[in-house]
Design a protein with these regions (language model features):
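Start-transfer (signal-anchor) and selected internal transmembrane alpha helices
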Residues: 4-8, 15-121, 127, 222, ...
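Transmembrane-helix motifs of polytopic, lipid-linked glycan transferases
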Residues: 215-247, 276, 404-412
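Transmembrane-helix signature of polytopic, membrane-embedded enzymes
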Residues: 237-257, 419-420
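Membrane-interface alpha helices of multi-pass inner-membrane proteins
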Residues: 259-263, 279-280, 289-314, 429-435
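Short acidic/glycine- and proline-prone juxtamembrane loop motifs at membrane-interface regions
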Residues: 264-272
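Specific aromatic-rich, kink-prone transmembrane helix
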Residues: 272-288
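Perimembrane helix-loop-helix junctions
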Residues: 307-337, 341, 345
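Aromatic/glycine/proline-enriched transmembrane-helix motif characteristic
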Residues: 365-435, 517-571, 575-587
Length: 588
Protein backbone atom coordinates (compact mmCIF):
# COMPACT_ATOMS: atom_id res chain seq x y z
CA UNK A 1 0.00 0.00 0.00
CA UNK A 2 3.00 2.26 -0.25
CA UNK A 3 3.74 2.23 -3.95
CA UNK A 4 4.05 5.41 -5.91
CA UNK A 5 3.03 3.62 -9.12
CA UNK A 6 -0.53 2.85 -8.14
CA UNK A 7 -3.52 1.32 -9.95
CA UNK A 8 -5.66 3.21 -12.45
CA UNK A 9 -9.11 3.98 -11.07
CA UNK A 10 -12.10 4.52 -13.40
CA UNK A 11 -13.78 7.90 -13.11
CA UNK A 12 -15.66 10.44 -15.16
CA UNK A 13 -13.36 11.32 -18.03
CA UNK A 14 -15.13 14.67 -18.51
CA UNK A 15 -14.50 15.84 -14.94
CA UNK A 16 -11.43 16.85 -13.06
CA UNK A 17 -10.49 14.69 -10.14
CA UNK A 18 -11.64 16.09 -6.79
CA UNK A 19 -8.74 17.33 -4.66
CA UNK A 20 -7.71 15.51 -1.51
CA UNK A 21 -9.23 16.57 1.79
CA UNK A 22 -6.99 14.69 4.23
CA UNK A 23 -9.05 12.39 6.47
CA UNK A 24 -12.34 13.27 4.72
CA UNK A 25 -11.00 12.36 1.27
CA UNK A 26 -12.46 8.85 1.15
CA UNK A 27 -15.87 10.01 2.35
CA UNK A 28 -15.98 12.85 -0.18
CA UNK A 29 -15.13 10.53 -3.05
CA UNK A 30 -17.73 8.01 -1.94
CA UNK A 31 -20.37 10.74 -1.91
CA UNK A 32 -19.41 11.86 -5.37
CA UNK A 33 -19.73 8.33 -6.70
CA UNK A 34 -23.35 8.16 -5.67
CA UNK A 35 -24.35 11.02 -7.94
CA UNK A 36 -26.35 10.02 -10.99
CA UNK A 37 -24.20 12.19 -13.23
CA UNK A 38 -21.33 9.70 -13.03
CA UNK A 39 -20.86 8.11 -16.43
CA UNK A 40 -17.81 5.95 -15.77
CA UNK A 41 -17.49 3.31 -18.51
CA UNK A 42 -16.58 0.69 -15.88
CA UNK A 43 -17.89 -0.10 -12.40
CA UNK A 44 -16.06 2.00 -9.84
CA UNK A 45 -13.83 0.31 -7.30
CA UNK A 46 -15.31 -0.02 -3.85
CA UNK A 47 -12.14 1.20 -2.11
CA UNK A 48 -10.70 4.42 -3.50
CA UNK A 49 -8.26 5.28 -0.74
CA UNK A 50 -5.12 6.94 -2.09
CA UNK A 51 -1.99 8.39 -0.52
CA UNK A 52 -2.32 11.55 -2.61
CA UNK A 53 0.01 13.51 -0.36
CA UNK A 54 2.93 11.21 -1.17
CA UNK A 55 5.67 12.79 -3.22
CA UNK A 56 5.87 11.18 -6.65
CA UNK A 57 9.23 11.94 -8.29
CA UNK A 58 7.81 11.37 -11.78
CA UNK A 59 5.58 14.40 -11.18
CA UNK A 60 7.80 16.73 -9.16
CA UNK A 61 11.40 16.06 -10.19
CA UNK A 62 13.01 16.24 -13.60
CA UNK A 63 15.31 13.31 -12.80
CA UNK A 64 12.41 11.19 -11.57
CA UNK A 65 10.38 12.09 -14.66
CA UNK A 66 13.22 11.05 -16.95
CA UNK A 67 13.69 7.73 -15.17
CA UNK A 68 9.93 7.10 -15.17
CA UNK A 69 9.84 7.37 -18.96
CA UNK A 70 12.28 4.45 -19.11
CA UNK A 71 9.94 2.15 -17.18
CA UNK A 72 6.57 3.11 -18.62
CA UNK A 73 5.98 6.76 -17.89
CA UNK A 74 4.92 8.88 -14.92
CA UNK A 75 2.14 8.17 -12.47
CA UNK A 76 -1.25 8.78 -14.06
CA UNK A 77 -3.47 11.55 -12.75
CA UNK A 78 -6.18 9.04 -11.81
CA UNK A 79 -3.81 6.58 -10.12
CA UNK A 80 -4.50 5.33 -6.63
CA UNK A 81 -1.22 6.01 -4.86
CA UNK A 82 0.05 3.42 -2.43
CA UNK A 83 -2.21 0.54 -3.46
CA UNK A 84 0.18 -1.75 -5.34
CA UNK A 85 0.79 -4.87 -3.29
CA UNK A 86 3.74 -6.37 -5.12
CA UNK A 87 6.11 -3.61 -6.25
CA UNK A 88 5.95 -1.38 -3.20
CA UNK A 89 8.48 1.47 -2.97
CA UNK A 90 10.50 -0.40 -0.36
CA UNK A 91 10.76 -3.53 -2.50
CA UNK A 92 11.74 -1.48 -5.52
CA UNK A 93 14.45 0.22 -3.46
CA UNK A 94 15.66 -3.13 -2.15
CA UNK A 95 16.02 -4.31 -5.76
CA UNK A 96 17.95 -1.15 -6.65
CA UNK A 97 20.15 -1.56 -3.59
CA UNK A 98 20.95 -5.16 -4.52
CA UNK A 99 22.12 -4.01 -7.95
CA UNK A 100 24.43 -1.40 -6.42
CA UNK A 101 25.67 -3.84 -3.79
CA UNK A 102 26.50 -6.28 -6.58
CA UNK A 103 28.41 -3.49 -8.31
CA UNK A 104 30.18 -2.83 -5.02
CA UNK A 105 31.25 -6.46 -4.79
CA UNK A 106 32.39 -6.46 -8.42
CA UNK A 107 34.72 -3.50 -7.81
CA UNK A 108 36.51 -5.62 -5.18
CA UNK A 109 36.47 -8.85 -7.21
CA UNK A 110 39.89 -8.26 -8.77
CA UNK A 111 41.43 -8.33 -5.29
CA UNK A 112 39.75 -11.65 -4.48
CA UNK A 113 41.84 -13.69 -6.90
CA UNK A 114 44.02 -16.12 -5.00
CA UNK A 115 47.30 -17.92 -5.44
CA UNK A 116 48.62 -21.19 -4.06
CA UNK A 117 47.41 -24.76 -4.04
CA UNK A 118 45.92 -27.05 -1.47
CA UNK A 119 43.10 -26.28 0.96
CA UNK A 120 41.72 -22.80 1.50
CA UNK A 121 43.91 -21.99 4.49
CA UNK A 122 47.01 -22.47 2.31
CA UNK A 123 45.89 -20.01 -0.36
CA UNK A 124 46.31 -16.25 -0.22
CA UNK A 125 44.87 -13.29 -2.10
CA UNK A 126 46.89 -12.29 -5.15
CA UNK A 127 47.83 -8.65 -4.63
CA UNK A 128 51.04 -8.86 -6.64
CA UNK A 129 52.32 -5.74 -8.43
CA UNK A 130 50.07 -3.52 -6.30
CA UNK A 131 46.95 -4.88 -7.96
CA UNK A 132 44.73 -3.33 -5.28
CA UNK A 133 45.65 0.18 -6.42
CA UNK A 134 45.70 0.10 -10.19
CA UNK A 135 42.53 -2.03 -10.32
CA UNK A 136 40.80 0.17 -7.71
CA UNK A 137 39.81 -2.89 -5.67
CA UNK A 138 41.47 -2.15 -2.34
CA UNK A 139 39.58 -3.28 0.77
CA UNK A 140 40.82 -3.23 4.35
CA UNK A 141 39.09 -6.56 4.92
CA UNK A 142 41.69 -8.59 3.01
CA UNK A 143 44.96 -7.37 4.61
CA UNK A 144 43.37 -7.18 8.08
CA UNK A 145 42.70 -10.91 7.99
CA UNK A 146 46.41 -11.60 8.27
CA UNK A 147 47.63 -8.42 9.95
CA UNK A 148 45.29 -8.73 12.95
CA UNK A 149 45.97 -12.47 13.38
CA UNK A 150 42.47 -13.53 12.39
CA UNK A 151 44.04 -15.98 9.94
CA UNK A 152 45.51 -17.76 12.96
CA UNK A 153 42.12 -17.98 14.66
CA UNK A 154 43.15 -15.71 17.52
CA UNK A 155 40.65 -13.67 19.49
CA UNK A 156 40.80 -9.90 18.93
CA UNK A 157 41.93 -7.70 21.83
CA UNK A 158 43.58 -10.68 23.51
CA UNK A 159 46.28 -11.24 20.91
CA UNK A 160 48.98 -8.76 20.00
CA UNK A 161 51.82 -8.43 17.53
CA UNK A 162 54.92 -6.29 17.11
CA UNK A 163 54.91 -3.55 14.50
CA UNK A 164 57.80 -3.97 12.04
CA UNK A 165 59.26 -1.95 9.19
CA UNK A 166 59.56 -3.07 5.57
CA UNK A 167 62.65 -5.13 6.45
CA UNK A 168 60.93 -6.98 9.29
CA UNK A 169 62.78 -5.06 12.00
CA UNK A 170 60.70 -4.30 15.11
CA UNK A 171 59.71 -0.65 15.33
CA UNK A 172 60.54 1.41 18.41
CA UNK A 173 58.13 4.01 19.71
CA UNK A 174 59.16 7.60 20.37
CA UNK A 175 59.74 6.68 24.03
CA UNK A 176 62.04 3.76 23.19
CA UNK A 177 59.50 1.00 23.83
CA UNK A 178 58.76 -1.74 21.29
CA UNK A 179 55.66 -0.92 19.24
CA UNK A 180 53.05 -3.52 20.24
CA UNK A 181 49.76 -3.56 18.36
CA UNK A 182 46.26 -4.91 19.03
CA UNK A 183 43.07 -4.87 16.98
CA UNK A 184 42.22 -1.23 16.31
CA UNK A 185 38.44 -1.49 15.96
CA UNK A 186 35.62 -0.94 18.48
CA UNK A 187 34.38 -4.08 20.17
CA UNK A 188 31.29 -4.84 18.10
CA UNK A 189 33.21 -4.50 14.83
CA UNK A 190 36.02 -6.66 16.21
CA UNK A 191 33.58 -9.37 17.26
CA UNK A 192 31.95 -9.18 13.84
CA UNK A 193 35.31 -9.83 12.21
CA UNK A 194 35.96 -12.72 14.58
CA UNK A 195 32.59 -14.34 13.76
CA UNK A 196 33.22 -13.88 10.03
CA UNK A 197 36.59 -15.56 10.48
CA UNK A 198 34.97 -18.46 12.35
CA UNK A 199 32.51 -19.03 9.51
CA UNK A 200 35.31 -18.85 6.93
CA UNK A 201 37.40 -21.39 8.85
CA UNK A 202 34.37 -23.65 9.23
CA UNK A 203 33.92 -23.62 5.48
CA UNK A 204 37.60 -24.43 4.99
CA UNK A 205 37.31 -27.38 7.36
CA UNK A 206 34.20 -28.67 5.58
CA UNK A 207 35.85 -28.31 2.17
CA UNK A 208 38.57 -30.71 3.32
CA UNK A 209 36.09 -33.52 4.00
CA UNK A 210 33.20 -32.70 1.67
CA UNK A 211 33.00 -32.08 -2.08
CA UNK A 212 32.85 -28.30 -1.76
CA UNK A 213 34.65 -25.76 -3.97
CA UNK A 214 38.04 -24.85 -2.55
CA UNK A 215 38.07 -21.12 -1.80
CA UNK A 216 40.94 -19.21 -0.27
CA UNK A 217 40.10 -18.65 3.38
CA UNK A 218 40.73 -14.91 3.18
CA UNK A 219 38.34 -14.68 0.22
CA UNK A 220 35.67 -16.58 2.13
CA UNK A 221 36.25 -14.23 5.07
CA UNK A 222 35.67 -11.27 2.77
CA UNK A 223 32.52 -12.81 1.30
CA UNK A 224 31.03 -13.60 4.71
CA UNK A 225 31.79 -10.11 5.99
CA UNK A 226 30.43 -8.55 2.79
CA UNK A 227 27.17 -10.48 3.12
CA UNK A 228 26.59 -9.04 6.58
CA UNK A 229 27.54 -5.55 5.41
CA UNK A 230 25.07 -5.84 2.54
CA UNK A 231 22.31 -6.73 5.01
CA UNK A 232 23.33 -3.74 7.12
CA UNK A 233 23.03 -1.42 4.12
CA UNK A 234 19.63 -2.87 3.24
CA UNK A 235 18.67 -2.09 6.83
CA UNK A 236 19.86 1.48 6.25
CA UNK A 237 17.64 1.72 3.16
CA UNK A 238 14.67 0.32 5.11
CA UNK A 239 15.16 2.71 8.02
CA UNK A 240 15.61 5.72 5.73
CA UNK A 241 12.40 4.90 3.87
CA UNK A 242 10.58 4.81 7.19
CA UNK A 243 12.08 8.15 8.20
CA UNK A 244 11.31 9.88 4.90
CA UNK A 245 7.58 10.17 5.59
CA UNK A 246 5.58 11.18 2.53
CA UNK A 247 8.87 11.47 0.56
CA UNK A 248 9.55 7.73 0.75
CA UNK A 249 11.20 7.68 -2.68
CA UNK A 250 14.03 9.84 -1.35
CA UNK A 251 15.43 6.66 0.19
CA UNK A 252 16.15 5.44 -3.34
CA UNK A 253 19.17 7.76 -3.23
CA UNK A 254 20.53 5.66 -0.37
CA UNK A 255 19.97 2.47 -2.34
CA UNK A 256 21.50 3.90 -5.52
CA UNK A 257 24.27 6.03 -4.06
CA UNK A 258 27.46 6.02 -6.16
CA UNK A 259 29.37 5.77 -2.88
CA UNK A 260 28.04 2.23 -2.45
CA UNK A 261 29.90 1.09 -5.55
CA UNK A 262 33.35 1.91 -4.16
CA UNK A 263 32.99 2.08 -0.38
CA UNK A 264 30.38 -0.36 0.91
CA UNK A 265 32.92 -3.20 1.20
CA UNK A 266 36.05 -1.13 1.82
CA UNK A 267 35.61 -1.41 5.57
CA UNK A 268 32.94 -2.26 8.15
CA UNK A 269 31.20 1.12 8.52
CA UNK A 270 27.87 -0.13 7.14
CA UNK A 271 27.32 -1.96 10.45
CA UNK A 272 27.22 1.29 12.39
CA UNK A 273 25.24 3.06 9.67
CA UNK A 274 22.47 0.45 9.76
CA UNK A 275 22.24 0.51 13.55
CA UNK A 276 22.38 4.31 13.80
CA UNK A 277 19.71 4.89 11.15
CA UNK A 278 17.49 2.27 12.79
CA UNK A 279 17.98 4.13 16.06
CA UNK A 280 16.67 7.30 14.44
CA UNK A 281 13.67 5.35 13.16
CA UNK A 282 12.93 4.08 16.66
CA UNK A 283 13.14 7.65 17.94
CA UNK A 284 10.79 8.85 15.20
CA UNK A 285 8.29 6.18 16.25
CA UNK A 286 8.52 7.37 19.86
CA UNK A 287 10.36 4.38 21.24
CA UNK A 288 13.17 6.14 23.10
CA UNK A 289 14.57 3.09 24.89
CA UNK A 290 14.87 1.09 21.67
CA UNK A 291 16.43 4.13 20.02
CA UNK A 292 19.03 4.25 22.78
CA UNK A 293 19.77 0.53 22.46
CA UNK A 294 20.34 0.81 18.71
CA UNK A 295 22.45 3.95 19.01
CA UNK A 296 24.45 2.25 21.75
CA UNK A 297 25.05 -0.77 19.53
CA UNK A 298 26.02 1.51 16.65
CA UNK A 299 28.48 3.30 18.92
CA UNK A 300 29.98 -0.04 19.91
CA UNK A 301 30.67 -0.61 16.20
CA UNK A 302 31.80 2.95 15.37
CA UNK A 303 31.71 5.91 17.72
CA UNK A 304 30.01 8.36 15.36
CA UNK A 305 26.39 7.37 16.27
CA UNK A 306 27.02 8.99 19.66
CA UNK A 307 26.94 12.31 17.80
CA UNK A 308 23.22 11.74 17.18
CA UNK A 309 22.51 12.45 20.83
CA UNK A 310 23.76 16.04 20.60
CA UNK A 311 21.04 17.31 18.20
CA UNK A 312 18.42 15.47 20.25
CA UNK A 313 19.69 17.23 23.36
CA UNK A 314 19.46 20.65 21.70
CA UNK A 315 15.94 20.04 20.44
CA UNK A 316 14.93 18.61 23.81
CA UNK A 317 16.10 21.81 25.50
CA UNK A 318 14.19 23.96 23.03
CA UNK A 319 10.99 21.93 23.31
CA UNK A 320 11.31 21.42 27.04
CA UNK A 321 11.02 17.66 26.58
CA UNK A 322 14.02 15.92 28.07
CA UNK A 323 12.41 12.90 29.73
CA UNK A 324 12.35 10.74 26.59
CA UNK A 325 15.85 11.86 25.70
CA UNK A 326 17.10 10.91 29.17
CA UNK A 327 15.78 7.38 28.63
CA UNK A 328 17.46 7.24 25.22
CA UNK A 329 20.79 8.37 26.62
CA UNK A 330 20.59 5.96 29.53
CA UNK A 331 19.75 3.06 27.21
CA UNK A 332 22.59 4.01 24.84
CA UNK A 333 25.12 4.21 27.68
CA UNK A 334 23.95 0.93 29.21
CA UNK A 335 24.05 -0.87 25.85
CA UNK A 336 27.50 0.45 24.98
CA UNK A 337 28.80 -0.55 28.41
CA UNK A 338 27.20 -3.99 28.22
CA UNK A 339 28.97 -4.70 24.92
CA UNK A 340 32.32 -3.24 25.97
CA UNK A 341 32.56 -4.24 29.63
CA UNK A 342 33.61 -7.92 29.19
CA UNK A 343 36.46 -7.01 26.82
CA UNK A 344 37.33 -3.96 28.91
CA UNK A 345 37.76 -6.11 32.03
CA UNK A 346 39.41 -9.15 30.44
CA UNK A 347 41.70 -7.42 27.92
CA UNK A 348 42.05 -3.76 28.93
CA UNK A 349 45.19 -3.21 26.85
CA UNK A 350 43.57 -4.54 23.70
CA UNK A 351 40.27 -2.76 24.37
CA UNK A 352 41.94 0.65 24.65
CA UNK A 353 43.86 0.26 21.38
CA UNK A 354 41.10 1.98 19.41
CA UNK A 355 41.29 5.11 21.54
CA UNK A 356 45.08 5.02 21.72
CA UNK A 357 45.44 4.70 17.96
CA UNK A 358 43.09 7.61 17.26
CA UNK A 359 45.00 9.78 19.72
CA UNK A 360 48.38 9.20 18.07
CA UNK A 361 47.26 9.38 14.43
CA UNK A 362 48.40 12.39 12.44
CA UNK A 363 46.48 14.24 9.77
CA UNK A 364 45.20 11.66 7.31
CA UNK A 365 45.73 11.98 3.58
CA UNK A 366 42.00 12.71 3.05
CA UNK A 367 41.85 15.53 5.62
CA UNK A 368 41.68 19.26 4.94
CA UNK A 369 44.96 19.66 6.80
CA UNK A 370 46.74 17.44 4.29
CA UNK A 371 45.12 19.36 1.43
CA UNK A 372 46.70 22.56 2.75
CA UNK A 373 50.04 20.80 3.18
CA UNK A 374 50.01 19.46 -0.38
CA UNK A 375 49.51 22.88 -1.96
CA UNK A 376 51.55 25.09 0.36
CA UNK A 377 54.44 22.98 1.61
CA UNK A 378 53.27 23.53 5.17
CA UNK A 379 54.59 20.79 7.48
CA UNK A 380 51.57 20.64 9.76
CA UNK A 381 50.97 21.54 13.38
CA UNK A 382 53.40 18.88 14.68
CA UNK A 383 56.24 18.68 12.13
CA UNK A 384 58.77 16.73 14.22
CA UNK A 385 57.13 13.72 15.80
CA UNK A 386 58.64 10.40 16.74
CA UNK A 387 57.10 7.06 15.85
CA UNK A 388 53.63 6.85 17.47
CA UNK A 389 54.09 10.18 19.24
CA UNK A 390 50.67 11.85 19.67
CA UNK A 391 50.27 15.11 17.69
CA UNK A 392 49.20 17.23 20.65
CA UNK A 393 48.79 20.50 18.76
CA UNK A 394 46.77 18.89 15.97
CA UNK A 395 44.54 17.09 18.47
CA UNK A 396 43.92 20.37 20.29
CA UNK A 397 43.10 22.25 17.09
CA UNK A 398 40.70 19.53 15.91
CA UNK A 399 38.94 19.49 19.27
CA UNK A 400 38.58 23.28 19.39
CA UNK A 401 37.27 23.46 15.83
CA UNK A 402 34.66 20.79 16.49
CA UNK A 403 33.60 22.52 19.72
CA UNK A 404 33.13 25.74 17.75
CA UNK A 405 31.05 23.89 15.16
CA UNK A 406 28.91 22.38 17.90
CA UNK A 407 28.45 25.83 19.44
CA UNK A 408 27.29 27.21 16.08
CA UNK A 409 24.87 24.29 15.66
CA UNK A 410 23.54 24.90 19.16
CA UNK A 411 22.94 28.57 18.36
CA UNK A 412 21.06 27.64 15.18
CA UNK A 413 19.01 24.98 16.95
CA UNK A 414 17.97 27.24 19.82
CA UNK A 415 17.42 30.54 18.01
CA UNK A 416 15.99 29.61 14.58
CA UNK A 417 12.42 30.98 14.27
CA UNK A 418 11.09 27.49 13.61
CA UNK A 419 12.55 24.47 15.36
CA UNK A 420 14.98 22.64 13.03
CA UNK A 421 14.35 19.05 12.08
CA UNK A 422 16.31 16.25 13.75
CA UNK A 423 17.83 15.12 10.44
CA UNK A 424 19.02 18.64 9.64
CA UNK A 425 20.92 19.08 12.89
CA UNK A 426 22.25 15.52 12.83
CA UNK A 427 23.62 16.00 9.33
CA UNK A 428 25.26 19.28 10.34
CA UNK A 429 26.85 17.64 13.38
CA UNK A 430 28.28 14.61 11.56
CA UNK A 431 29.37 16.66 8.54
CA UNK A 432 31.15 19.17 10.80
CA UNK A 433 32.90 16.32 12.58
CA UNK A 434 34.21 14.92 9.30
CA UNK A 435 35.24 18.29 7.89
CA UNK A 436 37.37 19.34 10.86
CA UNK A 437 38.55 15.87 11.87
CA UNK A 438 42.12 14.77 11.19
CA UNK A 439 40.88 11.54 9.60
CA UNK A 440 38.29 11.16 6.84
CA UNK A 441 38.67 7.66 5.49
CA UNK A 442 36.79 7.20 2.19
CA UNK A 443 34.19 4.88 3.71
CA UNK A 444 33.28 7.50 6.33
CA UNK A 445 31.24 9.25 3.64
CA UNK A 446 28.68 6.45 3.98
CA UNK A 447 27.77 7.98 7.34
CA UNK A 448 26.44 11.05 5.57
CA UNK A 449 24.35 9.34 2.89
CA UNK A 450 21.11 8.63 4.84
CA UNK A 451 21.47 11.85 6.85
CA UNK A 452 21.90 14.00 3.73
CA UNK A 453 18.92 12.36 2.04
CA UNK A 454 16.73 13.11 5.06
CA UNK A 455 18.10 16.61 5.68
CA UNK A 456 18.17 17.94 2.12
CA UNK A 457 16.08 15.84 -0.31
CA UNK A 458 17.10 17.66 -3.49
CA UNK A 459 17.95 14.69 -5.63
CA UNK A 460 20.22 16.21 -8.25
CA UNK A 461 22.20 18.19 -5.69
CA UNK A 462 22.75 15.06 -3.61
CA UNK A 463 23.72 12.97 -6.62
CA UNK A 464 26.27 15.62 -7.59
CA UNK A 465 27.89 15.45 -4.15
CA UNK A 466 27.80 11.64 -4.02
CA UNK A 467 29.39 11.39 -7.45
CA UNK A 468 32.20 13.78 -6.51
CA UNK A 469 32.75 11.92 -3.25
CA UNK A 470 32.79 8.53 -4.96
CA UNK A 471 35.28 9.71 -7.58
CA UNK A 472 37.79 10.66 -4.87
CA UNK A 473 38.58 6.94 -4.81
CA UNK A 474 40.14 6.92 -8.29
CA UNK A 475 42.94 9.49 -7.83
CA UNK A 476 43.45 8.22 -4.28
CA UNK A 477 44.28 4.73 -5.51
CA UNK A 478 46.50 5.97 -8.33
CA UNK A 479 48.30 8.33 -5.98
CA UNK A 480 49.10 5.38 -3.69
CA UNK A 481 50.12 3.26 -6.68
CA UNK A 482 53.90 3.03 -6.54
CA UNK A 483 54.60 2.83 -10.27
CA UNK A 484 56.15 6.21 -11.22
CA UNK A 485 55.02 5.94 -14.84
CA UNK A 486 51.37 5.19 -13.98
CA UNK A 487 50.68 6.84 -10.63
CA UNK A 488 49.20 10.32 -10.16
CA UNK A 489 50.78 13.27 -8.35
CA UNK A 490 49.45 14.10 -4.91
CA UNK A 491 47.79 17.33 -6.02
CA UNK A 492 45.42 15.46 -8.33
CA UNK A 493 44.17 13.53 -5.34
CA UNK A 494 44.03 16.46 -2.91
CA UNK A 495 42.16 18.55 -5.49
CA UNK A 496 39.35 16.01 -5.56
CA UNK A 497 39.37 15.91 -1.76
CA UNK A 498 38.99 19.69 -1.72
CA UNK A 499 36.09 19.48 -4.19
CA UNK A 500 34.46 16.85 -1.98
CA UNK A 501 34.85 19.03 1.10
CA UNK A 502 33.47 22.08 -0.71
CA UNK A 503 30.47 20.02 -1.85
CA UNK A 504 29.76 18.96 1.74
CA UNK A 505 30.11 22.57 2.90
CA UNK A 506 27.58 23.62 0.26
CA UNK A 507 25.17 20.97 1.54
CA UNK A 508 25.63 22.33 5.07
CA UNK A 509 24.95 25.86 3.83
CA UNK A 510 21.77 24.77 2.07
CA UNK A 511 20.57 22.95 5.17
CA UNK A 512 21.12 26.05 7.32
CA UNK A 513 19.36 28.19 4.69
CA UNK A 514 16.31 25.93 4.80
CA UNK A 515 16.31 25.90 8.60
CA UNK A 516 15.72 29.66 8.50
CA UNK A 517 13.24 29.34 5.63
CA UNK A 518 11.14 26.25 6.42
CA UNK A 519 8.73 27.20 3.65
CA UNK A 520 11.45 26.13 1.22
CA UNK A 521 11.98 22.80 2.99
CA UNK A 522 10.65 20.00 0.78
CA UNK A 523 10.06 17.81 3.82
CA UNK A 524 8.01 20.33 5.77
CA UNK A 525 5.79 21.56 2.96
CA UNK A 526 2.73 19.54 2.07
CA UNK A 527 3.82 18.89 -1.48
CA UNK A 528 2.53 20.06 -4.84
CA UNK A 529 -1.18 20.81 -4.64
CA UNK A 530 -1.38 20.21 -0.90
CA UNK A 531 -4.25 21.92 0.84
CA UNK A 532 -3.94 24.22 3.83
CA UNK A 533 -6.40 21.97 5.66
CA UNK A 534 -3.94 19.14 5.40
CA UNK A 535 -1.21 21.27 6.96
CA UNK A 536 2.45 20.63 6.43
CA UNK A 537 4.76 18.15 8.07
CA UNK A 538 6.70 19.33 11.10
CA UNK A 539 9.39 16.66 11.36
CA UNK A 540 9.04 13.00 10.32
CA UNK A 541 12.09 12.15 12.47
CA UNK A 542 11.07 14.37 15.37
CA UNK A 543 9.46 11.76 17.59
CA UNK A 544 8.30 13.50 20.76
CA UNK A 545 9.47 16.84 19.33
CA UNK A 546 7.18 16.73 16.29
CA UNK A 547 4.52 19.47 16.48
CA UNK A 548 5.63 20.38 20.00
CA UNK A 549 5.55 24.01 21.05
CA UNK A 550 8.77 25.73 22.06
CA UNK A 551 9.22 25.65 25.84
CA UNK A 552 12.87 26.41 26.63
CA UNK A 553 13.87 26.56 30.29
CA UNK A 554 13.43 29.92 31.98
CA UNK A 555 17.11 30.21 32.84
CA UNK A 556 18.09 30.12 29.16
CA UNK A 557 19.41 33.60 28.23
CA UNK A 558 17.37 35.69 25.83
CA UNK A 559 20.04 35.56 23.10
CA UNK A 560 19.62 31.77 23.00
CA UNK A 561 15.86 31.86 22.55
CA UNK A 562 13.93 31.55 19.26
CA UNK A 563 13.87 34.67 17.08
CA UNK A 564 10.15 34.89 16.43
CA UNK A 565 10.20 38.07 14.39
CA UNK A 566 11.76 36.64 11.23
CA UNK A 567 9.04 36.72 8.62
CA UNK A 568 11.13 34.59 6.26
CA UNK A 569 10.54 31.63 8.56
CA UNK A 570 6.81 31.76 7.88
CA UNK A 571 6.87 32.09 4.12
CA UNK A 572 4.81 29.42 2.41
CA UNK A 573 4.57 30.07 -1.25
CA UNK A 574 1.97 28.12 -3.30
CA UNK A 575 4.68 26.00 -4.90
CA UNK A 576 6.90 25.73 -1.83
CA UNK A 577 6.60 21.96 -1.85
CA UNK A 578 8.06 21.68 -5.31
CA UNK A 579 11.70 20.74 -5.75
CA UNK A 580 13.38 24.01 -6.78
CA UNK A 581 15.89 22.08 -8.85
CA UNK A 582 13.03 20.96 -11.13
CA UNK A 583 13.11 23.20 -14.16
CA UNK A 584 10.78 21.32 -16.47
CA UNK A 585 7.06 21.79 -17.03
CA UNK A 586 6.14 18.14 -16.64
CA UNK A 587 2.92 17.50 -14.78
CA UNK A 588 0.93 14.31 -14.38
Amino acid sequence: KRSGMGTRKPTDVNKKRAPARCDSHAAAVTGALSQSSNISPLPLAADLRSADNRDCPSRTDVLGAALANVVGGPVGRHALIGRTRLMTPLRVMFAIALVFLALGWSTKAACLQSTGTGPGDQRVANWDNQRAYYQLCYSDTVPLYGAELLSQGKFPYKSSWIETDSNGTPQLRYDGQIAVRYMEYPVLTGIYQYLSMAIAKTYTALSKVAPLPVVAEVVMFFNVAAFGLALAWLTTVWATSGLAGRRIWDAALVAASPLVIFQIFTNFDALATGLATSGLLAWARRRPVLAGVLIGLGSAAKLYPLLFLYPLLLLGIRAGRLNALARTMAAAAATWLLVNLPVMLLFPRGWSEFFRLNTRRGDDMDSLYNVVKSFTGWRGFDPTLGFWEPPLVLNTVVTLLFVLCCAAIAYIALTAPHRPRVAQLTFLTVASFLLVNKVWSPQFSLWLVPLAVLALPHRRILLAWMTIDALVWVPRMYYLYGNPSRSLPEQWFTTTVLLRDIAVMVLCGLVVWQIYRPGRDLVRTGGPGALPACGGVDDPVGGVFANAADAPPGRLPSWLRPRLGDEHARERTPDAGRDRTFSGQHRA
